[in-house]
Amino acid sequence: MCQIPAPSYKEEKKAEYIRERFWEIGLRDVRIDAVGNVLGIWPGTGEGPSVMLAAHTDTVFPEGTDLTIRKEGNRYYCPGINDDTHAVAEMIAVAKAMIHADLHTKGDLIFCANVCEEGLGDLRGVKYLFGYDNKASEECPEVDAFVSIDNQYTGGVIYTATGSHRYEVTFTGRGGHSFQNFGIPNPIHAMGRAIAQIAEFQVPNEPKTTFNVGVIQGGTSVNTISGSA
């Protein structure tokens, strides 16, 4: 599974692989939803809350990354194996063990391999499941509790989560030649001033609050006033 490329928004091949595994081990109502999440249910007795166990399919590595697996000692190494492909494998193993033992919890267990957790994916898969993008439909299951497997460490459970907002901002102008059109508004200058002001934001220590300007782009040449940034 580690050798299936799966950058955010391009997890289709890994999703198909996981769907096949869900079918093979015997999960019920196996499907891929409208945004690419893979879902399978192990039904409970109907006497308790439904719990979703989830792990994300995408990785931070772009297409073309060498995904050769190597072994050193008792460890395996491969881009994406830690975040989060190992967790998908663990989730499948849990489902397989429960089915093999015919073990049923009181409520349904919903196994989910969710898409677009990383970076610009902006939690798209989970937001869809819980209706945050206003596109969720009746295909999204009712969930009372959600457990995400996304850490190589053991011995603890994080029971609160950090909220996040991501913004893409574009500054535009008419552009021109840096000599002939000198003095017209320059989107790059405007962006620079905005970033400088953002850097002055005062945020609380508790709850921990952070911000970051991560990527900036703009301009076409050294003697051109950019039309956008």
Named regions from a protein language model:
Residues E16-R19, V88-K96, K127-F130, E168, ...:
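Predominant activation on well-ordered alpha-helical scaffold segments within soluble catalytic domains
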Residues G44-P49, G163-S164, N223-A229:
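A short, glycine/Asx- and small/polar-enriched loop/turn
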Residues R75, G80, D84-S164:
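Acidic/histidine-rich catalytic neighborhood of metal-dependent amide-processing enzymes
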Residues N181-I225:
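Acidic-enriched catalytic cores of C-N bond-cleaving enzymes acting on peptides and small amides
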Residues M1-P79:
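Acidic/His- and Gly-rich active-site-bordering loop/insert found
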